[in-house]
Amino acid sequence: MGTIADIAATEQNAERFWIVVHRDGAPSLRLTVDQDVLLQFRLKKGMEISDDLLQHIVYADEVKKAYQQALYFLAHRMRSEHEVAAHLRKKGAPDSVIDEVLKKLRAERYVDDEAFAAAYVRTQKKTAAKGPLLVRAELERLGVPDRLIEQSLAEYTLDEQMAIARSLYEKAKKQRRDESARAFLERVRQQLMRKGFPHEVIAAVLADGGTHTEQEEREALSVQAEKAHRRYAHHPRPLYEQKMRQALYRKGFALDLINEWLRMHGNDE
């Protein structure tokens, strides 16, 4: 048992107060509490305070501090409950305090995993052109329950997936380097896979997108062949042709086009 000997605002924060408790047979105790905790327990000078009540006061203040930390964390963008819990845990809050804070945040709609998941899917498909598989993995990492992930991804229609994947394909086509049609398609396939699009969507987009014209393929082959020629020109002709075929075939060019180029440049030094 003890008695509150003094209550005074702290210099650093006007919303926090020093409380000095004189305890029977023990050193005086000094602690700070939030003004809301002060009002919640109706603390005042001269009030007798038991050890049990003191523990409740300290716990309530821990919850209040963690709640304020959570609000600051949420001020930047929407967060999942898992993100908030991880942030508070990193700040040193015990699980019991985190549970209390999340309960309060849910009641006040500051956290809502259903709304968070739906907004996350909308944002990632529109601003980052991500496919559903990548979005799913990110939501799982953010701790969103499977049921809510399924529910939010149900709004990511197949038509939307196709449209976004086609847009990425067309962008890659405009930036196409001097490469074979096969190499180009494989590069785009890998890009779409990294973006999280399912195989059936990728296959459909690549099938619909078309490839190089024959002239474009020849031009790309010519560029790559000139590069390979500079590497292998010092070899005797049989070895030179073997290495040229191997290098250009690895680049995805057809053997008939490679042989045609070699015939046309048979007299090159």
Curated annotation (Swiss-Prot):
Main location: cytoplasm
GO biological process, one term: regulation of DNA repair
A single Gene Ontology CC term: cytoplasm
Record's subcellular location: Cytoplasm
UniProt xrefs under HAMAP family: RecX (MF_01114)
Protein's organism: Geobacillus kaustophilus (strain HTA426)
Listed name of the protein: Regulatory protein RecX
Keyword set includes Cytoplasm: yes
Protein encoded by which gene: recX
Protein task: Modulates RecA activity.
Keyword terms: Cytoplasm
Signal peptide bounds: none
Top-rank taxon: Bacteria
Family: Belongs to the RecX family.
Pfam families: RecX_HTH1, RecX_HTH2, RecX_HTH3
